Swiss-Prot record:
UniProt similarity note: Belongs to the UPF0301 (AlgH) family.
Name the UniProt record assigns to this protein: UPF0301 protein A1C_00165
InterPro entries: AlgH-like
SUPFAM superfamilies assigned to the protein according to its UniProt record, in alphabetical order: VC0467-like
Any one Pfam family match given in the protein's UniProt record, by short name: DUF179
Record HAMAP family: UPF0301
């Protein structure tokens, strides 16, 4: 057998296949891939809304100019390190970026962006995500071979759409797939 060809999925979106991942955090999840190398992969689930938080109290922003709560949705990015928070956001905001992508998206993980969002000076679009998803070397490739994920190009309007519950169905529709045509037995051609 020959060597497997590695396809970098950084900046792509993974779409959980129906009836294969049937429960848990990955059921009907969408994951924006932050990094994918031969050493492993890291991504953020962006459609698993868990709550809303007040940025001012959550980040202990001390400023009397903000008199009302600044409520933002909080998403669960995956099962790893829930104490870590990330802002997946549009690239119009470029202060102290953790990651900057070519598809008009960026990731920040610092207090400054939360303050800027609270003051209305942050990015046009953003999601606050806690935790992340990670794969060991070869693990994601194995899951792709087992048809646990579909891969699609990233679309920032899709990521920042208002209704997180509809994003997975919208992703299937974008791929030209109707969920009812999936069976529990799917395979590679």
């Amino acid at each position: 057998m020959g060597d497997k060809i590695f396809h970098n999925l950084s900046s792509k979106t993974l779409v959980a296949t129906p009836h294969v991942i049937t429960k848990g955090i990955y059921h009907k999840s969408l994951i924006y891939m932050l990094s994918h190398t031969e050493e492993g992969a890291i991504g953020l689930i962006f459609n698993r809304l868990v709550n809303h938080i007040d940025l001012k109290s959550f980040f202990k922003i001390k400023n009397d100019d903000i008199t009302t709560p600044v409520m933002v949705p909080i998403y669960l990015g995956g099962p790893v390190e829930h104490e870590k928070g990330f802002f997946l956001h549009s690239s119009d905001y470029n202060k102290n970026l953790l990651l900057d992508f070519q598809n008009d998206l960026a990731v920040s993980s610092n207090l400054e962006i939360s303050e800027d969002i609270a003051f209305g000076k942050g990015p046009k679009n953003s999601l606050f995500i806690v935790g992340y998803t990670a794969w060991k070397p070869g693990q994601l490739e194995e899951e792709l071979e087992r048809n646990l994920w579909l891969v699609m190009d990233c679309n920032k309007e899709f990521i920042f759409a208002d209704n997180p519950e509809d994003k997975w169905h919208s992703a299937l529709k974008h791929l030209g797939i109707d969920e009812i045509y999936f069976s529990a037995q799917i395979g590679n051609a």
